[in-house]
Structures are given as C-alpha cells and as structure tokens.
C-alpha cells in the first residue's frame, strides 16, 4: 500500500550562483544559514536542521558541467517525511513492485 508523505523534508539544489540563492531564499522564506562551508550551505526557516541545501558547483566542478560528471545546475534531490518508518517501507515495496 502506498502512503502519502506527511511533508516535504528538504530540497537540495546545485548552483553556480550561491550568493544569489542564499540571498533569495533568505528574503522569500526567511531562511537562515545553519551551516556553510565553501562547497555547500544548509538553510532552515523552522526547527529542522535544514529545509534547503545548496551545492556550489563553482567549487565542486570549477571547470564546468562535464557530461561525464553530470554536474549540472538544478534540483539535486527532494526528501520526504513519512508518518512512520512502516509507511515509508510499505511505499517503497509498493513502488518497487510497479
């Protein structure tokens, strides 16, 4: 049985415009930086450690988007919160069988 997630946990983006992204998400969502190093930053607007993360491709892949490394800009991944571990597992089993 597939169970709908309870909430969107976080979104991770790959960017070459780190400062602009941090400024924009700070202004629009009231997000604050929880942790930052030269290659990445984690932002939150509530009690979670992070709701947004940004990977700075100008640090990770300074030569550009090599098709072999697939370091393109955009969404890296989404994470979801499920009501329980059992609900997550049941959804996994259901999706795996499709």
Please provide the spans of the model-predicted regions:
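Eukaryotic phosphotyrosine signaling hubs
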Residues: 8-10, 73-78
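Conserved acetyl-CoA-binding loop of GNAT-fold acetyltransferases
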Residues: 27-34, 98
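Vicinal oxygen chelate
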Residues: 14-20, 78-98
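Short acidic N-proximal helix/loop "leader" segments that mark the beginning
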Residues: 1-5
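N-terminal capping/interface segment
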Residues: 6-8, 14, 42-44
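Conserved short beta-strand elements that form part of the metal-binding/catalytic scaffold
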Residues: 32-73
